[in-house]
């Protein structure tokens, strides 16, 4: 996308006319039109005003970041030598406006991986926790100690008493670590939906148009002296609208990837371009996969639209291979160290 095209895109995204921008910049309509038509480059002073108007850095305005770049800091598998792997997920996301940490994995493994990948976590300006399980939020304290300023968006129910049940052992606590009170002033608690800005929206509790909770049957919430199935009201998803593309990011999609995708479609008017996250079709501690019937139904339900799916973590190898026969090249594996850059010219992968 040329700079002139980028200017037009930004203006149209805000629902503004050319004369509105000219007035805001204190220049004539003709002068502004020359910028959008590619007849003249703005002077630095005008660029600074444009950047301030759109709340962008100069780099983002002039196109040094005209894409959404997603790097898997941590996943169950490591795609590069020297990186840690652990059961969990942590993604680093760069947009024209933001540097985002989405989930922190089970511990501090994501820190060494970030260093090895050249990711500066001190520059992260906001973090998102997808849900209240320790394989996604176990590294929360580690992040807060490395980065002392980024707000952390998490659902108001994220600190619930969440457990995994087993036939032959006691219920195991899998909620967020205790002792995070010292960082409470960093937390921004969300509910069903929160619009952070024009790029980022968080949403939870997608309507159940598809029954996909069977794969989460052993996951529970403690209520009094007993347990009840976890309804995953504490799970939220990140919808990104940036660089002319739409990206949907989920942690485990416990509420069902089809339901989450359908909710995103209702907000966008179309399916997102790219999805990142687990499908939760692999159940610990026993390690059984979801039924072939459920996997196939999900695969067929994901066919409409042109969304490219990057998945891993709790999807499981068996389910991934089976889904691959249905979705083909639209299904791609996540692994630690991989990067996908989503821009106007498509997706560029680095592994």
Where are these regions (language model features)?
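Conserved beta-strand hairpin/beta-sheet module of binuclear metal-dependent hydrolase folds
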Residues: 68-117, 231, 235-250
